[in-house]
Design a protein with these regions (language model features):
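AAA+ P-loop NTPase catalytic core and its hallmark functional loops
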Residues: 1-196
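Alpha-helical lid/collar subdomain of P-loop NTPases
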Residues: 1-6, 22, 175-245
Length: 245
């Protein structure tokens, strides 16, 4: 069963937990703020596995993030320092979260090819003398996230060879009923009618975005809805809170 404070389809939750337990790779797709990253942390916590987080969409230097750097010291000369990623993949049963893989530089995909391959499972440290290979430890699971939707202009088309190394879980935005239940649990002091009105407005915006000719272009995520509710708690009206976000 999924955690009570987290809304996810039971079958998808079971599949996610099963893949982490067996050290298999999962790609979580869906709009920003729909719970992809949260689901990974909650599933890992459920299994008592450590999560190592790497935001590949934010790095402009994938070699430094995934392999390491060569440095020069005037006393000892040139030396190589391994990245945190190198040490993370050597920890048994670790969960490696590759956030925003869809925004990563293609060089990151090239580096990850052998790492994610279910048979090869190694990383070559080609920046280091003799280019040693690091084997991925037993039970390590790689969870990637990818945002989808027309508002994600920085998103790249992921290489087919990379996609084939993952099983897919599509995460959806919450229904109005589920979102209301979530907000009611998080903000029990907010008036019920206010929460219902908020969920209705958000639901109408999402429906508009999913039409053939939407007048709006930016999806309101569950994360955004929670932020609006926080502002309402602090005395903002629904309209003012929505405008600020």
């Amino acid at each position: 069963e999924p955690p009570k404070d987290f809304f996810i389809d039971k079958l998808k939750w079971k599949f996610l937990v099963r893949n982490i337990e067996k050290g298999k790779n999962i790609m979580m797709t869906g709009p920003s703020g729909c719970g992809k990253t949260d689901a990974t942390f909650k599933a890992a916590n459920y299994l008592e596995r450590e999560v190592h987080y790497f935001n590949l969409g934010a790095t402009q230097d994938p070699r430094s993030t995934l392999i390491g750097n060569t440095h020069y010291n005037k006393d000892s000369g040139t030396y190589f320092s391994e990245s945190l990623f190198v040490s993370a993949i050597q920890q048994e049963n670790a969960v490696i979260l590759l956030d925003e893989l869809s925004r990563a530089h293609p060089e990151a995909w090239n580096i990850l090819m052998t790492v994610l391959d279910p048979i090869q499972r190694y990383l070559r440290l080609d920046e280091k003398d003799d280019s040693p290979t690091i084997k991925v430890a037993k039970g390590v699971s790689f969870i990637a996230t990818a945002n989808v939707g027309m508002e994600y202009t920085a998103t790249r088309v992921i290489d087919r060879a990379i996609l084939d190394r993952f099983s897919l879980i599509e995460m959806d935005v919450l229904s109005e009923d589920d979102e209301y239940t979530l907000l009611k649990g998080k903000f029990p002091t907010i008036d019920e009618n206010t929460l219902l009105q908020l969920c209705s407005i958000v639901g109408d915006i999402r429906k508009e975005i999913n039409t053939d000719s939407p007048r709006l272009s930016t999806m309101i995520s569950t994360r955004n809805t929670i932020e609006i509710a926080e502002l309402i708690m602090d005395g903002f009206s629904i309209q003012d809170a929505a405008e600020l976000l």
